[in-house]
Regions:
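A short, well-structured juxtamembrane/interface segment
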Residues: 77-95, 103-109
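Long amphipathic alpha-helical segments
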Residues: 1-74
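Small/polar-residue-rich loop-to-helix segments that shape phosphate-bearing ligand pockets
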Residues: 66-83, 136
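Conserved phosphate- and dinucleotide-binding cores of soluble alpha/beta proteins
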Residues: 123-262
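Glycine-rich phosphate/diphosphate-binding loops that line cofactor/substrate pockets in enzymes
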Residues: 88-98, 114, 159
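Short glycine-rich phosphate-binding loop at a beta-alpha junction
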Residues: 97-102, 119-121
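Glycine/charged-rich beta-loop-alpha catalytic/anionic-binding loops adjacent to active sites
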Residues: 4-11, 116-118, 165-171
Length: 262
């Protein structure tokens, strides 16, 4: 498939994990690097369709901000694939913790290695089935899991010692969460439950790029940095203000605009 066609397919993709989309897009952008005038519109098209996908913003910034776009795309893909955040999260969880969290690949990978923990996971039926299968395939059997629908925040947080959420994207002023994750965070705050933000490779952007995301869709909300207890990322746990100010990608002028898509 020609890289332009591959990128169009990625742009049209529905509700798919943004890290997976960025890895797929990196391959196509690396091939497209020989046509430099096509790179900017290709990146903008991706972001018009997935304007809250932190890893895609991060990838496009790496590619457009590099004198060697092909090498930058390949290096970015490798970083996304080798992201150690799940392992860092697994190592940070307190012993026998009761963890509440929306379903996400990073959280499930971490829980797969912690059979001493208990998990209250939130998601639609298909997502919950996938999560149960993923966690159960851990070498040690994984955490014990109970599944809940998105409309049950009080039940999810009952008895929980820790709430873990993964943002669409984050930056210096906070993190953009799905509506259901934001509802959980609000209920958890009222109940005094500690909140950890899991922000893997590509999820934290510098202020100029994060500003482009703040017009987000009606189904997403901003979680303020002061409402976060800790951020778990590729380097392990970090104080929230420091972690969310650590977006270290270029801010190419070609991305200094606000996408209108959703």
């Amino acid at each position: 498939m020609h890289p332009i066609e591959q990128l169009r397919a990625i742009a049209r993709a529905g509700d798919i994990d943004s890290t997976f989309l960025a890895i797929e897009a990196a391959d196509a952008l690396a091939e497209l690097a020989s046509e430099p005038r096509a790179l900017v519109p290709a990146c903008r098209r991706l972001l018009e369709h997935h304007h809250l996908a932190g890893p895609l913003w991060w990838l496009c910034a790496q590619v457009l901000g590099s004198p060697d776009p092909a090498a930058a795309a390949e290096q970015a893909a490798a970083q996304l694939i080798e992201d150690p955040t799940a392992e860092e999260l697994a190592g940070c969880l307190p012993g026998a913790a009761v963890v509440a969290a929306p379903c996400s690949a990073t959280v499930c990978d971490a829980l797969a290695g912690r059979p001493d923990c208990h998990a209250h996971l939130v998601g639609e039926p298909l997502a919950l089935r996938r999560a149960l299968r993923s966690i159960g395939q851990g070498a040690a059997g994984g955490a014990e899991v109970l599944g809940y629908g998105p409309s049950q925040p009080d039940e999810v947080l009952d008895g929980a010692s820790l709430l873990i959420v993964e943002p669409a994207v984050a930056g210096p002023s906070g993190a953009i969460l799905s509506e259901s994750a934001a509802n959980l965070a609000e209920v958890g705050r009222a109940m005094g439950v500690a909140l950890w933000l899991v922000a893997g490779v590509g999820k934290v952007l510098p202020a100029p790029l994060f500003a482009n995301c703040l017009s987000g869709g009606v189904d997403h909300r901003l979680l303020a940095v002061e409402d976060i207890t800790a951020v778990i990322g590729p380097s392990g746990p970090t104080e929230p203000t420091k972690a969310l100010a650590a977006g270290d990608v270029p801010c190419p002028p070609e991305l200094a605009y606000r996408p209108t898509g959703g």
